[in-house]
From Swiss-Prot:
Record text on subunit structure and interactions: Homodimer.
Protein name, per record: Phosphoribosyl-AMP cyclohydrolase
Main location, first listed in the record: cytoplasm
One Gene Ontology molecular-function label: phosphoribosyl-AMP cyclohydrolase activity
Organism: Burkholderia cenocepacia (strain HI2424)
Amino acid sequence: MNTETKSLPAWLDKVRWDDNGLVPVIAQEASTNDVLMFAWMNREALAKTIETQRAVYYSRSRKRLWFKGEESGHVQHVHEVRLDCDEDVVLLKVEQVSGIACHTGRHSCFFQKFEGTVDGGDWVAVEPVLKDPEHIYK
């Protein structure tokens, strides 16, 4: 994670970063308001997102910036960036290129819906796979 924040813009200080220097981010399709995905950003990722108008996240597993679509081509063009009332969650209103945001090949990462009751329910996939992930990631 980039700990050199001196050269980053002062407006980043308004965001309430967690103890790891991260903030949760929701990506939402600008045209439909569909919630596409949840991810994390550090200061550098948020600044890069504003600068490029493309979604850049911070990968906690890879411990580096993750340019959405860098492998798949499924980039997110950012139309608007919002900060919630507590200043601890970022919302990106995006155009999802190719319509696929999820690594499973679906439009949204939120493709599983709970059906049933507390005693007899389960999660059911309610969105189709638009493209086989094996053909997305080579």
